[in-house]
Amino acid sequence: MATEEAKIKLFWLEKSRAQNILWLLEELKVDYEIEVFRRSSDMLAPPDLKKIHPLGKSPLVSVTAPGPSSEPIILAESGFITQYLSEHFGHQTTMMPKRWKDGQENKVGGETEEWLRWQYTLHFVEGSFMSTLMMAVVIGMLKSNKIPFFLRPITSMVANQILSSFVLPNLKGLLAFLEKQLETSGGDFLCGKNLTSADILLSYGLVSVKDRLEEFGSWPVGGPKKLYPKLFAYIARLESEPGYKKSFEKIKEIDSSLEIEY
């Protein structure tokens, strides 16, 4: 496949994980189009996205191989999109680490440590991490001003019990794991010295929750930043990456009124 000639289109929904796919596309140095979708007044995705993929979720990406008879391939789910784009377009970048140790190609156990970390992290983000994070955010909404004030004491009590007994202990375990991964990576990023698409996939959850962690329950003196210094330094590095900043600029160039969540 002549990947340099493939046509890539990102269906971008405001306040969604489509933003970190945009960052990935910037890092891959490929040409791509963006079609923008706005959320409805109830913050749901518009029905038009279901015309592209039956679930109507974001992000969505279409990839069309070169040739007059080629049909677009529709990619859905952040992890799958990230892996597909990295494998097809990332070989001249750092987005996907080298897979095989020299002389051990296609052998069991022949994979490099960097590639194993990359592959694992793609699944970790979509499995353990984002599910726990979303649970914390959704349960935390039971304490918000959106709940009628006369019900809020009850819903807050229930939310606090669930958060303290189950969600927060799990979340702390995940953050401690990421702290250890950074400590042992041999570089500034999860897979080593270079930024990869696994870092980009993880970035959305980390950046969006970094200032909200103390809402989910009690922490030792000093809070999350003291417990996970390497992780918070890592988040700051991600936010300072040129591609991260460029992804915001791209959307603002299209329409400065669009809401970006990260």
Task: Report each predicted region and the residues it spans.
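Residue-level signal for nonpolar/aromatic packing positions in well-ordered secondary structure
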Residues: 25, 61, 178, 199, ...
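A general structural signal marking secondary-structure boundaries and capping sites
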Residues: 89, 182-186, 242
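GST-like fold's C-terminal all-alpha helical module
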Residues: 121-236
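Charged/polar, low-hydrophobicity segments characteristic of intrinsically disordered regions
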Residues: 236-256
